[in-house]
Structures are given as structure tokens and as C-alpha cells.
């Protein structure tokens, strides 16, 4: 049974600052506060003007307590669009209430409705609570993959 006190909805254009606060909360949880360079203006432009990604917000008893930021990828093997979940975060005071599961249910509904092939994401290897949560949901770990990155300061060297 879903908790009526919890509402999952798409973020509105006026909520760039709230999204940035949640990103900072995630960064603090991951011990990466110094890595957040995004500004409210960048969040607004990339999410609501360029529409580079989408954001779901979780409200608990009328207060915003979490977010899920995702964008679309494509599988050449499946011939289908996928959802890539970049970030999922629920504030500490709202954890354990089923909000993470509701985010995934919402993403799964989007994927079903649009005929997408997968929902994929990565998780920090030390984040045991999240790993257990994902396993409990039936997610599979792809041990044969590694994530690589070229940052913007290296683009010209490629």
C-alpha cells in the first residue's frame, strides 16, 4: 500500500534552487561537497530550458524531501531508449518511508508507458545501504563493466 503522505511529481521551473539544495545534500551524504560546482542558473538552464534531464521530487507531508534526476540513453543492442538515473537522494529524516521505492515505481511506469528497455544507474561501492536496497528491488549488478570519464578540462587533449 502506498503512503498517501508521499507525493512523487516532476519538478517545476521555479524549483531550481530546491534542486540545487538537494544536490548539495546528496554531495554531503557522499562526502563530495567540494565537487558541487553547479549554480542555480545552470540548473535552470540545463533542466528547464535545454531539457537535458528530468527531475522528480518527493514530497512528504507537503515538504520536499528528495529527488531523482534522470535522462535518456539508447541501447543499440535492444534498439530502445533507456532511462539513466544520475542521482537519487532522500533526506535523512525521510528515509525508511518507501520514498526510494516510489521513485523507482515512477521511473518504471515511465519506462513501461514509453516502451523503454532499461533503467540503469551506478552506485558508490561503499554505499552499502543503497546496494542492499537495490538488491532487494531485484536490480542486477553488472560486474563486467567499468565507468570511464573524460572531464571538460581534458576535452581538448582527446
Say what each PLM segment does.
Residues 45-57:
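A short helix-loop-beta-strand connector motif used in the catalytic cores of GNAT acetyltransferases and
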Residues 96-109, 136:
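Conserved acetyl-CoA-binding loop-helix of GNAT-fold acetyltransferases
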Residues 57, 63-72:
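Conserved beta-strand in the GNAT
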Residues 88-95:
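A short, internal acetyl-CoA/4′-phosphopantetheine-binding micro-motif in the GNAT/acyltransferase core
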Residues 112-122:
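Conserved GNAT acetyl-CoA-binding A-motif
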Residues 20-46:
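Conserved GNAT-fold acetyl-CoA-binding loop/helix
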Residues 7-19:
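A short beta-loop-alpha structural element at the N-terminal edge
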Residues 101, 125-144, 150:
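Conserved active-site alpha-helix within GNAT-family acetyltransferase domains
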Amino acid at each position: 500500500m502506498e503512503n498517501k503522505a508521499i507525493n512523487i511529481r516532476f519538478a517545476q521551473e521555479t524549483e531550481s534552487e530546491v534542486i540545487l539544495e538537494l544536490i548539495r545534500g546528496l554531495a554531503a551524504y557522499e562526502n563530495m561537497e567540494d565537487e558541487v560546482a553547479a549554480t542555480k542558473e545552470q540548473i535552470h538552464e540545463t533542466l528547464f530550458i535545454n531539457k537535458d534531464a528530468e527531475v522528480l521530487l518527493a514530497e512528504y507531508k507537503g515538504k520536499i524531501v528528495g529527488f531523482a534526476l534522470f535522462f535518456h540513453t539508447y541501447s543499440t543492442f535492444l534498439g530502445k531508449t533507456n532511462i539513466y538515473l544520475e542521482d537519487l537522494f532522500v533526506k535523512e529524516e525521510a528515509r525508511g518511508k518507501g520514498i526510494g521505492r516510489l521513485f523507482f515505481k515512477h521511473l518504471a511506469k515511465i519506462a513501461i508507458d514509453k516502451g523503454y528497455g532499461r533503467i540503469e544507474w551506478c552506485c558508490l561501492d561503499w554505499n552499502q545501504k543503497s546496494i542492499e536496497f537495490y538488491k532487494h528491488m531485484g536490480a542486477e549488478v553488472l560486474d563486467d563493466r567499468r565507468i570511464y570519464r573524460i572531464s571538460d578540462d581534458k576535452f581538448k587533449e582527446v
